[in-house]
Structures are given as structure tokens and as C-alpha cells.
Curated annotation (Swiss-Prot):
GO biological process: protein localization; signal transduction
Organism name: Solanum lycopersicum
InterPro entries noted in UniProt: 14-3-3 (IPR000308), 14-3-3_CS (IPR023409), 14-3-3_dom_sf (IPR036815), 14-3-3_domain (IPR023410)
A Pfam match: 14-3-3
One GO cellular component, as annotated: cytoplasm
Family, as annotated: Belongs to the 14-3-3 family.
Cross-referenced SUPFAM superfamilies: 14-3-3 protein (SSF48445)
Oligomeric and partner information: Homodimer.
Protein name per the record: 14-3-3 protein 5
Length: 255
């Protein structure tokens, strides 16, 4: 007979197939809650990541669309519409805050402390940085500053471990470099630092491409392509600065 942990993992897979991501989160939260100092398996940690990625991703997309509509209504001077949209945006921001706080609590209370291998430490610290970055996307004032500082701290801790313990071609190290560079570009408005970080990660991986095992070749080369796409986009944005055109969003890992 399957253990409760195995049953919850099985049901998380079923929920994933059915695209019922809120319930997938609930099943994986039960798995994490039952941990007693031991680690999640690679399959389990990936399921947790996929569940939260989809739950947060839907709301981040909604927030971007609503913010865009709000800007259009403001420019047209439709104050009544703007007031209604602000209220609606606030509702989505409350949902985003709740989701981010949920996974950040799990990471701090259960997952980061029990991570024993380099790749799991980097995986969870990167995840911590990602969810603080999502908070920084919509928070304002001191809350935004605090979220950005926490993002930077988590990504830097992850980077220190990744540079010491993971190969430049490792998909988790590459994914971290991708998301860290997006943070510099989108949140800190530091295009030079974003480009330098992305280019260094890409160049270091290219130099060791022949050492890549078959199992991670596809994952690594996909992230390398995203790094290159962002570099192309960012250098073109920097040259076009001052134009009013809508900028294409940067590409991040697992989003």
C-alpha cells in the first residue's frame, strides 16, 4: 500500500495532467509539511516548482494585462474605469502576495535548511529569489525595496554555491544566471549588469558544451538560447531608448 507521501506525489502528478494547479500545490504542500529533516526527491521538488509556477504565472499574466488596460484608461481620462480597475488590480495583487508568501515560508522553514547537495541548495535559493522578484514586480515603496533586497540576497547566495559546485553547463546554474540577469534588467534597471551576467554565463557554458551529458543537453541549450535572446533584446532596447514603443518582456527560466 502506498504511503501518504507517495499518494500525494501521485495525486500531484494527476492534478498536473488535469491542469488543476491550485490542487497540485495543495498535494505538494502536504508532502513538504510531512518532511522531518529529509530532502524532497528531484521529482518532488520539480512537481512543487511546476505547481507554484503555474499558479503564480496565471496571476502575473492577469496583472500585466490589467495594468496595461489601467494605463490606457488613465491616458483617456476615464476616471471611473480607472477606479474600478485599480480595485480589481489590488485583488490580484493580494492573491500574488499570498501565493509568494506561501512558497517563501516553505522554502525558509523546510526546504533550504535541509538541502544537502549543491544542486538542491541552488534550486531552492533560486526559487526564493524568483518569488521575491515576483513580489518586487508589483509592490511599491519600501515593500518593493525590501522584496528587491531579498531577491538580490537569495540570488547571490545561490550564485556563490553554483559557481563553486555546479558546472557552467548545469541547467540549474544556467537558469539562475538567466533569472538573475532578468532581475537586474527588469527590477533594478541595470541593463549593463544584466548583459554582463547573461553574456558571462553564456560564454562559460559554450566553452564547456562538449562536456554536456545527453540527459541535460536539451535543458541547458534551451536556457542558453533564452540567454542569447535576452542579450539581443536588451542591446536593441538600449540602442532604441527614448522611443515610446511597448517593450517585449525578457525571457526567464520556468516562467
Amino acid at each position: 500500500m502506498a504511503s501518504p507521501r507517495e499518494e500525494n506525489v501521485y495525486m500531484a502528478n494527476v492534478a498536473d495532467e488535469a491542469e488543476r494547479y491550485e490542487e497540485m500545490v495543495e498535494f505538494m504542500e502536504k508532502v513538504v509539511a510531512a518532511l522531518n529533516g529529509e530532502e524532497l526527491t528531484v521529482e518532488e521538488r520539480n512537481l512543487l516548482s511546476v505547481a507554484y509556477k503555474n499558479v503564480i504565472g496565471a496571476r502575473r499574466a492577469s496583472w500585466r494585462i490589467i495594468s496595461s488596460i489601467e494605463q490606457k484608461e488613465e491616458s483617456r481620462g476615464n476616471e471611473d474605469h480607472v477606479a474600478s480597475i485599480k480595485k480589481y488590480r489590488s485583488q490580484i495583487e493580494n492573491e500574488l502576495t499570498s501565493i509568494c508568501n506561501g512558497i517563501l515560508k516553505l522554502l525558509d522553514s523546510k526546504l533550504i535548511g535541509s538541502a544537502a547537495t549543491g544542486d538542491s541548495k541552488v534550486f531552492y535559493l533560486k526559487m526564493k529569489g524568483d518569488y521575491y522578484r515576483y513580489l518586487a514586480e508589483f509592490k511599491t515603496g519600501t515593500e518593493r525595496k525590501e522584496a528587491a533586497e531579498n531577491t538580490l540576497s537569495a540570488y547571490k547566495s545561490a550564485q556563490d554555491i553554483a559557481n563553486g559546485e555546479l558546472a557552467p553547463t548545469h541547467p540549474i546554474r544556467l537558469g539562475l544566471a538567466l533569472n538573475f540577469s532578468v532581475f537586474y534588467y527588469e527590477i533594478l534597471n541595470s541593463p549593463d549588469r544584466a548583459c554582463n551576467l547573461a553574456k558571462q554565463a553564456f560564454d562559460e557554458a559554450i566553452a564547456e558544451l562538449d562536456t554536456l551529458g545527453e540527459e541535460s543537453y536539451k535543458d541547458s541549450t534551451l536556457i542558453m538560447q533564452l540567454l542569447r535572446d535576452n542579450l539581443t533584446l536588451w542591446t536593441s532596447d538600449m540602442q532604441d531608448d527614448g522611443t515610446d514603443e511597448i517593450k517585449e518582456p525578457s525571457k526567464a527560466d520556468n516562467e
